[in-house]
UniProtKB/Swiss-Prot annotation:
UniProt topology in membrane: Lipid-anchor
TPR repeats: 62-95, 96-129, 234-267
Subunit relationships: Homodimer.
Residues covalently joined to lipid (S-diacylglycerol cysteine): C19
Organism name: Escherichia coli O17:K52:H18 (strain UMN026 / ExPEC)
Superkingdom of the source species: Bacteria
GO biological process, one term: cell division
UniProt-listed SUPFAM superfamilies: TPR-like (SSF48452)
Main location class: membrane
Locations listed in the record: Cell membrane
PANTHER family: TETRATRICOPEPTIDE REPEAT PROTEIN 6, UDP-N-ACETYLGLUCOSAMINE--PEPTIDE N-ACETYLGLUCOSAMINYLTRANSFERASE SPINDLY-RELATED
Pfam families on file: TPR_16
Function: May be involved in cell division. May play a role in bacterial septation or regulation of cell wall degradation during cell division.
Protein name: Lipoprotein NlpI
Amino acid sequence: MKPFLRWCFVATALTLAGCSNTSWRKSEVLAVPLQPTLQQEVILARMEQILASRALTDDERAQLLYERGVLYDSLGLRALARNDFSQALAIRPDMPEVFNYLGIYLTQAGNFDAAYEAFDSVLELDPTYNYAHLNRGIALYYGGRDKLAQDDLLAFYQDDPNDPFRSLWLYLAEQKLDEKQAKEVLRQHFEKSDKEQWGWNIVEFYLGNISEQTLMERLKADATDNTSLAEHLSETNFYLGKYYLSLGDLDSATALFKLAVANNVHNFVEHRYALLELSLLGQDQDDLAESDQQ
């Protein structure tokens, strides 16, 4: 091949590759990963000052430790959050919300029996604490107790049938019992709902009503700012990951769980359990291992 023709061939190939990469970047829906805000940092500093003072009753100190733990958790600082929750519980052992968080952490670590006990404690202290049914249901789901998981997640769904994510978690549990029946129940829940919340688009994808491309187009159109985009992506990528996992497509599932985590929406259920899914899939790199141990 003559030098000039060879150069033209290489230039054309590079141009086509560049166009392909550019096209991919333009079509991909991405958000800037969420970062700590100045307001959150100021609140943490103020909490530290208040906790350092001695002018707090035990109840006030326990409550403030809990609130700081919640803030740490939202920033992904689970070791610090767990330390605050443990201190709060040592002062006031009757705080159901603290047991709820500790149960979530135990589930993420794969310590399911201890997680069940934590959520049992939540409901003993406050039978109306409905999110304990969600979190215990998820722990039972990952712990392989499918029928018990269904019972808890059904109770959680019945508390608000218009919440699409309650239907999705119930479907995931029932899918392990009878996939065909689970999809029919999901369809009934969709038809009965008001369909106002964004997550019903994910349900429509699960039902085969819309394509993945349409789902992502709706996601992009619905997001009002970067925060809502990051949240929607965390949710959507997690449930897409579960969908592909059910098809046996481990590579796609793994990639989607990583994308769910990448948005840093630390306090979302989908972020928490995308990490667990990656661990179960063998993606236990150092950062995942540290997360499970905290």
